[in-house]
Amino acid sequence: EAFANAEAKVGILDIDVYGPSIPNMVGLGSHQLGGAQEGVLEPVEAHGMKIMSMGFLATKDTPVVWRGPIASQLVQQFLGAVDWGELDYLFVDMPPGTGDIQLTLSQTVPLTGAVIVTTPQEIAHTIAEKGLRMFQQVKIPILGIVENMAGFTPPGSDEIFHIFGEGGGTSAAEEFDLPMLGKISIKQELREAMDNGTVFTDDNINSIASLIAVEAMAVVTNEELSPFAPQEINMANDGETLVIKWQD
């Protein structure tokens, strides 16, 4: 919303197919899309942003039990069959990992860059490192790192307890020579705002998460669009080697 408040035209694409959370965060958890008109889906508008998510297509209690290729087809449809109109920025919320969805996105559109979100513990650092290296392989710039769950702040206190460890995001930023965009501690009021769909209201706009968004905005707006888009991204027959073909 920091971008929308700066009068930019913003879209949010939630491609966490198996666990979409954006609809709840913007107060549209019960919203369901109607059918496509002539094969085109209209994004939902909230807080000055256009939003599309699997959460608008399936009810809360409906599990999405899809194999990777089907999920990849949905990503392609969200990119090509949604009437986004004219946008300055399209932000994509991806699931954790380095699977079909990430590869499909990398193959389908040229991306300005990626922001890596991790948590402080060592095991999360290892997983984030794989994501960092994947984006490097497909030549997508990494704009910076955000450390989530960076300590617990009890209600009515400013003291931070590092119950999940400390420094995982900073360590990754130093290892890969990347900007550390900020740290988000666990706060009851922020959790309640996300659950209630009020995280983007005026009462919460000065939260630490919003301040980090402003910092990220400065990085993104200074990053030129990557002119590179891979011609083909596939897994080799051994199931372990990523094969990337670039245009001449």
PLM features per residue range, with description:
Residues 1-3, 135:
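Hydrophobic alpha-helical packing residues
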Residues 84, 88-89, 95-192, 196:
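Conserved catalytic-core segment of NTP-binding enzymes
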Residues 16, 31-37, 54-70, 74-104:
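Switch II (G3) loop of P-loop NTPases
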Residues 194-206:
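C-terminal boundary of histidine-terminating zinc-finger modules
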Residues 14, 22, 52, 75, ...:
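Residue-level signature of catalytic and energy-coupling elements of molecular machines
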Residues 204-225:
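Histidine-centered active-site loop/cap adjacent to the catalytic His
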Residues 246-248:
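Conserved aromatic anchor
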Residues 3, 7-61, 72, 170:
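Phosphate-binding loop that captures ATP/GTP phosphates
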